[in-house]
Amino acid sequence: MKKLSEIIVRKRKIIFVVYAIAVVLCAVGIFNCKINYDMSKYLPDDSSVRKGMEIMSEEFGDSSAITVMFDGLDENKQLEMKADLEAIENVQSVVYIPNDETYQKDGHSKYMVTVSADTYSKNSRKVLDKIKDTYDDAYVSGAVVDNALMTDSLVGDLPVIALIAVIVIFMILFILCDSWAEPFIFMGCIGVAIALNMGTNAFLPSISFMTFSVGALLQLGLSMDYSIMLMNRYAQEKKKYDSHEEAMINALAHSVAPVSGSSVTTIVGLLALVFMDFKIGQDMGVVLAKGVFMSLVCIFTLLPGVVVAFDKMIEKSRKKSLEIPMTGVMKLVTKLGAVILPAVLIIVGFAYINKDDVKVGFLKVFDNSDQTYIEECFDYDNQTVLLYKNNESPETVANYIEWLEKRDDINSVQDYSNTLGVSFTPAEIAAQFGFEESQAQMMFQMSGKETMTTAEFLSTASSMLKNVPDSEEKLAQLKAAQELVDENTSQMLGNEYNRMVVSLRHESEGNKSFSAIGELIDEADERFEGTHYFVGDSVMGKEMNDGFKKELNFVTMLTVIAIFIVVILTFKAIFSSAILVAVIQSSVFITTLIIVLSGFTVNYIALILVQCILMGATIDYGILFTCNYIEERRTSDKKQAIGTAMNRSVKTILTSSLILIGCCLTTGLLMTQKAISQTCSMIACGTAVAVVMVVFVLPLVIYLTDKLATMQFGRKK
């Protein structure tokens, strides 16, 4: 290792050039990285919702919906607005029915706009922008609107958040570092690692908006301590060698094992996300683990050369080091052990019992004030699609629709059989299309039918009027109506599957919504003979909710076992490794309890990510203290060892943890996107809890179990 360290230090100029080229290439890669906003892409391969969405796209093409509402339109303007919206490019259809409370209520006019492009396409965004630019008084909601808010917030929020986070981290480093120059060197080195990680994301098919948003800041927070560990070792070696090159060579050679060991726990914890069924875990796990690895490579290959090159500047800018005496605190902790330990055990036990009571969110990522106002005016309009085989008996479909319409929580049911497939009498048809009733009756008699569907009548009327003089205007009206009917029919009847749209009077997620969706699915399973699929936000949320506890428990078990094995192998102590894992896992439970008691709804990925990051990253704080304690116990009694060990550890623990908390708290407070904000806030909270547990509880447990805690296999006494 020393030979390799010599090459890294002495050939530093070549390494600088290599990194400069790599950063330029990765800067290009950053702008070519594809960001995915469609969370349905991360559904498991065997997901019923995923399969249903694929079938719906194949059968009916891509489409998306925008709800548009206006206040105070008169009757003439209401119909004009429908025509104006229909005239917008890429608008497939607009549904608005005058005098129907679903669309017109208390002076509010609601239009359901269908766009002939998927939710995340440029064409859908163009339609939304056109509506907003043309009508300042329009209220808009829907998936297209949510996606627009999301992309706009990332563009607007991230630069501000990054700037403030960097300022916060510089302040922390200026306070805790021994030189005014060190923070700039540390941040520069990690900045290169972040650029490499973000640039190499271009080689991935895409990364999620969540990964893109938090990746850089989490990489910064999770790997800054590697720089500090190498710098501390360099300061020790400089006391032994006159040459700063020799000092760095030895510092690097001696730092590889502890720094690598520290990073391995973090990487293993993050890679546990890869084993989630919901593929957002793979996305975040791979990118974040890659980021920590990139940081590790930069610390080992770039930082040594930079430190040697700027050694004089570092020495000239030396300042008084902040000392945090912990000997007295540790004495107090051991004296109050009979109170602290039982209290902590009670809190952890209570947290474990209530860990499943946390309110988990899966879908809502924004508070859209327009959507809230529309729902206040018209109640919830939560649309769910049922795809069923087109050879299902009409009676089965009719009975299912009848069952749906009897429910109090159903706004409407739209199927071909109860819309375009409905047969009308001559009088009804005449009123619908502006014919004389006698004309309509004559057409019915000539066709030999007592009733007709809209499509049948349009076809019959068009063929009969072809040879009638002065009927061009009427034929043009019939042709336009026929095109509209054909277009709407194509959106309901597919080659293999038909589409039924059910509007529920529930929010998109929550116990009531998921329960209602479950009842709809169960009833369809009983009635329909062929394969069928439900598609919609609530269906996706229910599917995620059904598997969440299993997913969280699996990831928890995997991280605990994996980290326990890694700690044992690097630490060579079974009992103390078990204590470390137990303390950090207790921190996770306490963090969850704080969320439960606060009453907040937290995004599901936040809970899983907190488990992986706390277990993978903050356990390093415990490893550092325990290693120092075992070393001190070789020359002193346990009372003295506990104080000295914490004195040696606390500065590194605080520096690393405050940076992670600073990054996450800044993002949590300033990010308008809910899922990202909740995730980062929870990581910040969890890290703070972990620090308290490591600084006050872990030393007490190690102290009380001294003989077992200091036992290491494979080493002589």
Language-model-derived ranges and their functions:
Residues D381-Q383, I410, E487, G494-R499, ...:
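Active-site lining segments that contact anionic ligands and/or coordinate catalytic metals
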Residues K11, L85-V91, Y135, L336, ...:
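Acidic-histidine catalytic/liganding microenvironments
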Residues M1-I35, T119-G361, R527-K717:
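Membrane-embedded transmembrane helical bundles of large multi-pass transporters/channels
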Residues R50, E54, N76-E80, D84-I175, ...:
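Extracytoplasmic
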Residues N90-I97, N411-Q414, T601, R634:
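Short secondary-structure junctions
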Residues M39-V68, L73-K77, G337-S463:
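Juxtamembrane segments of multi-pass membrane proteins
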